[in-house]
Amino acid sequence: MKIVHVASELFPYVKTGGLADAVASLAGMLADSGHEVAVFLPGYRAALEHRDAAAAERRYRLKVEMGQQYLSGDVRVFSPRPNLSIFLICREEFFDRRAPYGNGERDYEDNSDRFIFFCKGVVETLRLADMQADVVHAHDWQAALLPLLLREAERRQGGMLAMKTIFTIHNIAFQGIFPRAVFARTNLPDELNSVDGLEYYEQINFMKAGILFADRVTTVSPRYAEEIQTPEFGCGLDGVVQTRESDLVGLLNGVDTKVWNPATDPLLPARYSRADLAGKRVCRAELLKRFGFAPDFDGPVFGMVCRLAEQKGVDLVLANQGFFLSQSCRLIVLGAGELRYETAMKALAARAPNKIALSAKLDEAMSHLIEAGSDFFLMPSLFEPCGLNQMYSQIYGTLPIVSRVGGLVDTVIDADQQPEKGTGLMCEPTSASLLDVLARAMTLFDDKPRYGTVQQRAMAREFGWNVAAAGYERLYRDTL
């Protein structure tokens, strides 16, 4: 099949979260299976500066209609591996910036124009290249206009762009909601500026367009597919999602085991496997040393790697700071995000530098070391569409402590509730429940034979992308 992916992030070119990993892994797995795969990505500064893009060819000039004006751009193309091409939709005014979505404190004010241009640029490139894909797969709100724009282009151009579309919701909390006046910049028919189209409480909602107009809708875990049809987790779009229930499927993300494998991981000071954990002990000592702790500390090490945001349960961790201050344990946090959380975590680390450490930045190598060197991985999310770190943790023999939400339910088994199957520990997304599970973690860690049994069971689990990619292949064929 000829498959086109459209996304705002792609590892290793630009990454702020799991979207980049998921799109890269799925596209790579499909390419390795012999499909002809193209990924469209905004021409961010970081992407253009990546070594893979050094040989990028400027292949097409774009002239994109945006309301009453036309904006120019160009398309640069390179191929980092067989069967995979990367198309960068470039316009310096929109994408030559330090970060993809905002300055750290707020979103860019022109994000609506940036991603309308991006989506329209993809449609125009497909036309210029006469690229008749079997499936166009759009990811999250930044690409959510694609199914509708392709439908309208097909209607105007007599079937030239007749392609099946898939829209994946990676996180329904981020929807691309803008003032209603933005609709004019899309040049879509006026009837779509309504409750049956993009209108959303006197604004417009990009994600709503993807949900309504794609041929099929997916999300990133079976549990999350159920949750987003409820008011508690649907973030105002639960009713819209319910209208597509028969076309909705939850396909669990996988792990790229070429990147995340403790036996081959080049970012670790020592490699290890389920059969030989000596390297994990080396990683643990190095992790403690890097953050200024005694490398031979014999209490549990809790690791946490995440965006510092409300969704990730940072409030719950802060509410339980008394536990980390009073217990013989260490807490190591890697993450950047909302200023209030960075400030609070820095203050906590400064209060107890002999127990708690924070590195407030994105550091891929350190994220690998935390996964390898910790004893437990904290992931007390308020909601979690799929989550990847809980899978990385199990592969690396680090027991995940997770909330009972979304994809975490589909991937972690509580060792207390199911002693013969458990691979981690689970709690409700409340501070009291997190405190209880932290106490359970201390008890489990002290029982070394039992901890070792759960660890072995966790490392034996299979989370490779081969299963997820096969599910998408079936979905693509069913959609054709």
From Swiss-Prot:
Keywords: Glycogen biosynthesis, Glycosyltransferase, Transferase. Gene3D superfamilies: Glycogen Phosphorylase B. It comes from the Bacteria. The keyword Glycosyltransferase applies. InterPro entries: Glyco_trans_1, GS/SS, Starch_synth_cat_dom. Its EC number is 2.4.1.21. Pathway: Glycan biosynthesis; glycogen biosynthesis. One of its GO terms (biological process) is glycogen biosynthetic process. ADP-alpha-D-glucose binds at residue 15. GO terms for molecular function: alpha-1,4-glucan glucosyltransferase (ADP-glucose donor) activity; alpha-1,4-glucan glucosyltransferase (UDP-glucose donor) activity. It catalyses: [(1->4)-alpha-D-glucosyl](n) + ADP-alpha-D-glucose = [(1->4)-alpha-D-glucosyl](n+1) + ADP + H(+). NCBIfam families: glgA, PRK00654.1-2. HAMAP family: Glycogen_synth. Synthesizes alpha-1,4-glucan chains using ADP-glucose. Belongs to the glycosyltransferase 1 family. Bacterial/plant glycogen synthase subfamily. This is Glycogen synthase. It comes from Opitutus terrae (strain DSM 11246 / JCM 15787 / PB90-1). The lineage of its organism: Bacteria, Pseudomonadati, Verrucomicrobiota, Opitutia, Opitutales.
